[in-house]
Amino acid sequence: MLKNVHQKASHHTRPFRAWVKLLWQRIDEDNMTTLAGNLAYVSLLSLVPLVAVIFALFAAFPMFSEVSVQLRHFVFANFMPATGDVIQRYIEQFVANSSKMTAVGACGLIVTALLLMYAIDSALNTIWRSKKVRPKVYSFAVYWMILTLGPLLAGASLAISSYLLSLRWASELNTVIDNVLRIFPLILSWLAFWLLYSIVPTLRVPNRDAIVGALVAAILFELGKKGFALYITTFPSYQLIYGVLAVVPILFVWVYWTWCIVLLGAEITVTLGEYRKLKLAAEQEEADQP
C-alpha cells in the first residue's frame, strides 16, 4: 500500500518537477538577473522624473490634492521598506527643485520617465521572446496611458480605502474593514502585476496564466518587503559601512530585488503556457505512434 501511495505521489509531482526545470531553464536562458540589474539602473535614473510627472498630474486635478499626500505615504511605506521616510524626504526635495525647471527641462523629465516604460516593455518582450513590434505611436500611447492612468487609479483606490476607514464607526463592519485594509497592498500589487503581464507583452497572454504569475509575484513582493525590512534592521551592515550614504545602496538593492520578483512573475506566467504546449505536443506524439 505504501508503495502504491509513493508511486501516486511520484506520478503527481513529476509534472511539477518538469515545470520547475523548464522555469529554471528559461530564467537561465533569458538572463533574468541581468535584465533585473538593467531595469534597476534605469529605474534609479528615472525615479525622480517619474515622481515629478506623477505629482504634476495630481496637481492638475484638485480633487486628488488630499489623496496625493496619502499616496506618497502609502507608496514609500509599502513599496520602500525600512528606509522609506529618508528616501521620501530626498525625493520630495529633488522634485521641488525640478519644479523650477523650464519647459524644455520638463519635457526632458517626461522623456526620461517614458524611457523607463520602454525598458520595461523591452525586458518583458525579451522574456516572452516576442519578435512582434508595436507601431511607435501605439507604444507611446500605451506608455503615456500607464504613466497617467496608473497614478490616478492608485489615487482612486486610496480614496476608496479612506472611505472604508470612515465607515469604521459601524462596529459590525469594523473587523471586515480591518481585514480588507490589511490585504489591500497585496490586492493592489496583484492587480498591478496582472495588468503588467497582460498589457505589455506584444503576444497574447492567457488570462489565467497572468493571474497566477501576478499572484505569485505579489506574494513574493509582500514577503520580500517584510524580509528586507527585517534584514536592514537586524543586520545594519550598510549603515556601519556607508554611514549617512547607506540609503543609496539600500535603495539600489531593494529596487533590484523588486525587479527580480517582477521578472520572476513574468517567467512563471510564460512558462505556464509553454509547458502546456509542450505537454500537449508530447501527448499528441504518443497518440500518433502505432
UniProtKB/Swiss-Prot annotation:
Keywords: Cell inner membrane, Cell membrane, Membrane, Transmembrane, Transmembrane helix. Its main location: membrane. It is found in: Cell inner membrane. InterPro entries: UPF0761_bac, Virul_fac_BrkB. The keyword Membrane applies. GO terms for cellular component: plasma membrane. It is a multi-pass membrane protein. The chain crosses the membrane at residues 44-64, 104-124, 140-160, 183-203, 210-230, 244-264. The keyword Transferase does not apply. Belongs to the UPF0761 family. PANTHER family: INNER MEMBRANE PROTEIN YHJD, UPF0761 MEMBRANE PROTEIN YIHY. This is UPF0761 membrane protein Ent638_4092.
